[in-house]
């Protein structure tokens, strides 16, 4: 079958022909319809330090997808051939303490689809049926293909009560922008997002951010004054992994403020812990999506009118995958969809 693979320990992704995956007793075989390019895929493409330590070569990559079930393992219940599904890209062990306690997103033995095992940039994908999510009919394929990163946004944004709160989001990548849309949809008062990329800040404005701030041109303190904020932000969502952005967030938080961190900073990051302590800040690390509460919330948010369509800015056939990767690497895109239809 046709697949996109990391074939060489250098910059690039290559179209290859690989054997179709084998179906296990508890698995689903999914015919892929659409996939989306993730920031992780760009790290793998660029063959950065993380990729060199993590990705076995060769490896079929990709983990954001929607497809149709075409075969079912003999032990599987609850799915049928023809079901339209997306799926959780974190394969968990099922036997560690967190898995047994129902906190599967915190499994210490997690294996990543398209990272540690063959991924979704292929004509067919096999995953455990446990990881599949059956999609409502009114969730279109393009949105279903980005449920993985949308789930990161939902998990992060809904970590804290948002109704009537003022929210600061640092990092206007696609996940940060979707988080801004979620915050507004569920009732936040002001949602301010910061970045240095004007293209993506404009996307954030289209998605409902109260203010999208280029921190090279504008001070957050001035924006807060314009919005009539006198006590700081109630909730912070750190999506950038940039130390200076996190420092600024800590400075601008209200006493008792709550911060959820999804962005991955450098290996070490110095912060003023005195401010954290004396402000009584709560900081929570976010990894992946809660299985499967986040997935049900994603579907419900879309069904209740949340419009994510502006975040999808580029669409290509899989044969033109290089154009898709070029668009993502340029920084002048939102989400990029690759279609696998003939």
From Swiss-Prot:
GO terms for biological process: L-threonine catabolic process to glycine. It catalyses: L-threonine + NAD(+) = (2S)-2-amino-3-oxobutanoate + NADH + H(+). It is an enzyme of class 1 (oxidoreductase). Pathway: Amino-acid degradation; L-threonine degradation via oxydo-reductase pathway; glycine from L-threonine: step 1/2. It is found in: Cytoplasm. InterPro entries: ADH-like_C, ADH-like_N, ADH_Zn_CS, GroES-like_sf, L-Threonine_3-DHase, NAD(P)-bd_dom_sf, PKS_ER, Zn_alcohol_dh. The record marks 148 as: Important for catalytic activity for the proton relay mechanism but does not participate directly in the coordination of zinc atom. Its cofactor is Zn(2+). Zn(2+) 1 binds at residues 38, 63-64. Pfam families: ADH_N, ADH_zinc_N. GO terms for molecular function: L-threonine 3-dehydrogenase activity; zinc ion binding. Its EC number is 1.1.1.103. GO terms for cellular component: cytoplasm. Disulfide bonds: none annotated. The active site is at 40 (charge relay system), 43 (charge relay system). Binds 2 Zn(2+) ions per subunit. Zn(2+) 2 binds at residues 93, 96, 99, 107. Coiled coil: none annotated. Gene3D superfamilies: Medium-chain alcohol dehydrogenases, catalytic domain (3.90.180.10), NAD(P)-binding Rossmann-like Domain (3.40.50.720). Keywords: Cytoplasm, Metal-binding, NAD, Oxidoreductase, Zinc. NAD(+) binds at residues 175, 195, 200, 262-264, 286-287. Belongs to the zinc-containing alcohol dehydrogenase family. Catalyzes the NAD(+)-dependent oxidation of L-threonine to 2-amino-3-ketobutyrate. Homotetramer. This is L-threonine 3-dehydrogenase. The gene is tdh.
